[in-house]
């Protein structure tokens, strides 16, 4: 037994190191080296070992990322050094004033600045001892924050163990919610009739202060680190012992990256103030291209010795300033207010606006969320309104310019019947959402089909909203399973669907039968079940029938599946109509199992490295990647001597030329089909 335990201990530590390495490649460097399926196998092996030998479980094990039971509150934590706020600069003049103050305090010295993006999130502190995360906290009042260690452990970019055993290190960073995750979260909350988050920052803050870590884990947060509050770096970082600490802030950022932290790559060093100012002003427009929200840039004196001499006021350091972007708003007119019916029956009022340019795009619509918000803001048809993008993402009406009213404006009220089917509408107690009561409502059906066919679900090319509207109107489709019964003669008469398009659509529908179980679960449109939850459920149950028979008690014990998701799943599969649709899908031949090769860890392409270049005729880039990974292969973004195959479509790029130079096997699309068995 002792030998078994020792072997298990060695293997568990080996697995932890390997998983930590792949977390670093994926979440920090954005260079994954293995497939999701291969990563899941490593995690499952570690979970089995720790379950068999509970004494092996460590606080830094990757299996401990999702916390246990909800807590009653958060304990207070005192920071090792104050987490000060930053003084603000709102224009070029104030930036130059900051530089003047720095140079006056450091007469005759050369000053270099580091400029970093100011992430719009929640400031947090992470404390490590001997390379192990022991505590994480919010900023709080700067001296004392709240202990949110268990919640921060669920953020995949937070290392539980550093790549080197640094004796003591307090790291500062910004937790945030990516724009895409924020949009998905609010869409789900709107469908559920829940209060929406105003912006990604509020969403991140609310997510990290959840008493239940499983809810935090489901929110897909991320974190960039930007500095340290305290550091005993030791010989783990400086092995020669000639110095014991970094000397520049830019060096700190590089060291943090080497230790396993995610550092924002958009930082620059400047010697000349004019270039620094130009760089800051240039980000005002560029920020909208980023996948996360930023509200400015932070300018810091690079030399740590100079930082120490400059010191700080009671509120903020003298060696740093935050350049804040001016809020981008525009005035436009509400032309009309119309109601959209979602796939769960929620009636969402939307303002039709006179088109206006805002935050890099033309805005012609803005969601008004629900009737309560319209009443609260007193929004009327014909009003001139101030609009902005919440978190630079979602257009919203900020305020009504009531002084501009002429008397011709019209008040608006939520219709008492569904605008699509005429059925009655209801508003559940405690909810802001109004819902259509008709399960067979054409608008609900249409939105559900759009979701089912979408790229992240069953990915049926050519089946867009216009075609779906015609199919529903003609009575050809009453649920998603009916798509698989469509015939050529059903499609040809439809507008804009000639013989060729009809054949292509039928082929796309047929191809979708082979999509993964995770995609099918997501496509079903179960309330609160997003892409990540669908993958977790697929990996856990391995079959749709297994998920259908799951109890609520069983579901809540799955990491990241909380009570709300569990209740929604049980409710969905308890519905007789839903079960009939699934039965039709099974009879049509739609895949309801996980890939056997993924489950058993093998496949005809096992271990082979592929690079994709050019445009494939019959595969999207994502489809080709999923096919390769399902057969055991993996995708690389660049060609090297370790590459086994380059799949070349039309107009291949430089990767094709490099493959020729290195003698790497090049496959055209037909050869790729033969290799993967998709003839």
From Swiss-Prot:
Q: Which domain of life is it from?
A: Bacteria
GO terms (BP aspect): DNA repair; DNA replication
Q: What is this protein called?
A: DNA ligase
- Which residues belong to any copy of the BRCT domain? 600-679
Assigned keywords, A-Z: DNA damage, DNA repair, DNA replication, Ligase, Magnesium, Manganese, Metal-binding, NAD, Zinc
Could you tell me which SUPFAM superfamilies the record lists for this protein? Answer: BRCT domain, DNA ligase/mRNA capping enzyme, catalytic domain, Nucleic acid-binding proteins, RuvA domain 2-like
- InterPro entries membership: BRCT_dom, BRCT_dom_sf, DisA/LigA_HHH, DNA_ligase, DNA_ligase_AS, DNA_ligase_CS, DNAligase_adenylation, DNAligase_N
Q: Lineage of the native species?
A: Bacteria, Bacillati, Bacillota, Clostridia, Eubacteriales
Which residues does NAD(+) bind? Answer: 36-40, 85-86, 116, 139, 174, 300, 324
Which residues form each disulfide bond in the chain? none
**Family under the similarity heading:** Belongs to the NAD-dependent DNA ligase family. LigA subfamily.
Query: Which SMART domains does this UniProt record tie to the protein?
Result: BRCT, HhH1, LIGANc
Which amino acids does the record list as binding Zn(2+)? 418, 421, 436, 441
């Amino acid at each position: 037994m002792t030998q078994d335990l020792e072997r298990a201990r060695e293997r568990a530590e080996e697995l932890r190191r390997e998983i930590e390495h792949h977390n670093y490649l994926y979440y920090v460097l954005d260079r994954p080296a293995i497939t999701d399926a291969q990563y899941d196998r490593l995690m499952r092996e570690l979970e089995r070992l720790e379950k068999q030998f509970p004494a092996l479980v460590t606080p830094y094990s990757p299996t401990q990322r999702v916390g246990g039971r909800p807590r009653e509150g958060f304990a207070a934590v005192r920071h090792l050094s104050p987490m000060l706020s930053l003084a603000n600069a709102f224009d070029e003049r104030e930036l130059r004033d900051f530089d003047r103050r720095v140079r006056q305090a450091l007469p005759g010295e050369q000053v270099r600045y580091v400029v970093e993006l100011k992430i719009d999130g929640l400031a947090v502190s992470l404390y490590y001892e001997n390379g192990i995360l022991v505590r994480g906290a919010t900023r709080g009042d700067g001296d004392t924050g709240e202990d949110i260690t268990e919640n921060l452990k669920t953020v995949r970019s937070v290392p539980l163990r550093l790549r080197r055993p640094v004796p003591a290190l307090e790291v500062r960073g910004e937790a945030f919610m990516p724009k895409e995750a924020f949009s998905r979260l609010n869409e789900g909350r709107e469908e559920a009739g829940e209060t929406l988050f105003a912006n990604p920052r509020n969403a991140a803050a609310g997510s990290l202060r959840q008493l239940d870590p499983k809810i935090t884990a489901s929110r897909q947060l991320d974190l960039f680190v930007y500095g340290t509050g305290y550091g005993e770096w030791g010989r783990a970082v400086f092995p020669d012992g000639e110095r014991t600490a970094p000397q520049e802030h830019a060096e700190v950022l590089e060291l943090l990256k080497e230790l396993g932290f995610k550092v924002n790559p958009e930082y620059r060093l400047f010697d000349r103030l004019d270039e620094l100012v130009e760089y800051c002003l240039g980000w005002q427009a560029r920020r909208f291209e980023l996948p996360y929200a930023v509200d400015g840039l932070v300018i810091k004196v690079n030399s740590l010795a100079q930082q120490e001499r400059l010191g700080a006021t009671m509120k903020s350091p003298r060696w740093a300033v935050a350049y804040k972007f001016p809020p981008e708003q525009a005035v436009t007119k509400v032309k009309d207010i119309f109601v959209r019916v979602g796939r769960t029956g929620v009636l969402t009022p939307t303002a039709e606006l006179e088109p206006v340019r805002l935050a890099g795009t033309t805005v012609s619509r803005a969601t008004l969320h629900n009737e309560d918000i319209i009443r609260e803001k007193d929004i009327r048809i014909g009003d001139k309104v101030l609009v902005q993008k919440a978190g630079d993402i979602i257009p919203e009406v900020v305020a009504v310019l009531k002084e501009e009213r002429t008397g011709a404006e019209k008040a608006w009220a939520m219709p008492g019947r569904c605008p699509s089917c005429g059925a009655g509408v209801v508003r559940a107690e405690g909810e802001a959402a109004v819902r259509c009561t008709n399960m067979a409502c054409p608008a609900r059906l249409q939105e559900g089909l759009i979701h089912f066919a979408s790229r992240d679900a069953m990915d049926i090319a050519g089946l867009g909203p216009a075609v779906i509207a015609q199919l529903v109107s003609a009575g050809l489709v009453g649920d998603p399973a009916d798509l698989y019964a469509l015939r050529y003669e059903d499609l040809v008469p439809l507008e804009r669907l000639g013989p060729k398009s009809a054949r292509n659509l039928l082929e796309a529908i047929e191809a979708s039968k082979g999509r993964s179980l995770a995609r099918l679960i997501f496509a079903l449109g179960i309330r609160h079940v997003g892409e990540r939850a669908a993958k977790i459920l697929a990996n856990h149950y391995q079959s749709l029938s297994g998920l259908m028979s799951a109890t609520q008690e069983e579901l809540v014990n799955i990491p990241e599946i909380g009570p709300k998701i569990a209740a929604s799943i049980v409710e969905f599969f308890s519905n007789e109509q839903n079960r009939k649709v699934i039965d039709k899908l099974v009879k049509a031949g739609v895949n309801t199992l996980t890939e056997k090769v993924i489950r058993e860890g093998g496949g005809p392409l096992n271990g082979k490295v592929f690079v994709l270049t050019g445009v494939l005729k019959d595969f999207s880039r994502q489809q080709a990647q999923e096919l390769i990974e399902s057969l055991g292969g993996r995708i690389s973004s660049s060609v090297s001597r370790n590459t086994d195959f380059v799949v070349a479509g039309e107009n291949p790029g430089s990767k094709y030329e490099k493959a020729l130079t290195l003698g790497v096997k090049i496959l055209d699309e037909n050869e790729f089909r033969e290799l993967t068995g998709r003839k």
